Design a protein with these regions (language model features):
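Domain-level recognition of nuclease-like catalytic cores that cleave nucleotide substrates
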Residues: 97-142
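Conserved catalytic cores of phosphodiester-cleaving nucleases, focusing on short active-site segments
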Residues: 36-39, 48, 66-78
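Mg2+/Mn2+-dependent nuclease catalytic core
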Residues: 76-101
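Residues immediately flanking
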Residues: 72-74, 93, 113
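Short mixed-charge
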Residues: 37, 43-63
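A short acidic (Asp/Glu
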Residues: 49, 81-83, 120
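A structural signal for short secondary-structure junctions
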Residues: 30-31, 62-65, 100-104
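Acidic-basic catalytic patches of nuclease active cores, encompassing PD-(D/E)XK
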Residues: 1-33
């Protein structure tokens, strides 16, 4: 798992749009805050790390099926269960739409900072466990 920033994120955006017609941005919003990290590994067995040059749109395109976008959520609240029951999770609309579009290539990693507990979930897992859902938009005008 690694963090990509700046031009690397823009190149990833270009590769998804060019090869899969998946837009990682909404309107003019190009900040790509809908994910924090990428995991680069073969999705088919044997699952192993894949080296991808994120400065090259072509290399990213060639390896898109091996890239999983990861959104990390963390908390140190003591009232959260070990399996993250009772966790009120902020989930942006962009994160949700991207997770749905990418299916199994988008994951949420939940981290309890105090306990060191970490779990990985798909968007379907989150919805299956959701007690309440409140979606909202936060918009900054020019």
């Amino acid at each position: 798992i690694r963090k990509i920033v700046g031009d690397e994120k823009l190149n990833l955006c270009k590769a998804f749009l060019k090869k899969e017609k998946i837009e990682l941005t909404i309107g003019k919003v190009k900040d790509l805050k809908a994910f924090d990290f990428v995991r680069c590994r073969k999705t088919k067995k044997p699952k192993r790390q894949v080296k991808i040059d994120f400065s090259s749109v072509e290399d990213i395109e060639k390896n898109l099926e091996n890239i999983t976008l990861i959104e990390m959520k963390s908390s140190d609240r003591i009232d959260i269960d070990k399996d993250f029951g009772k966790y009120f999770m902020p989930l942006g609309v962009r994160e949700f739409l991207l997770a749905v579009a990418l299916k199994d290539r988008y994951r949420f990693i939940l981290v309890h900072v105090g306990r060191g507990t970490i779990i990985e979930l798909r968007w379907q897992d989150i919805l299956a466990r959701a007690k309440t859902i409140n979606l909202d938009f936060k918009i900054t005008l020019e």
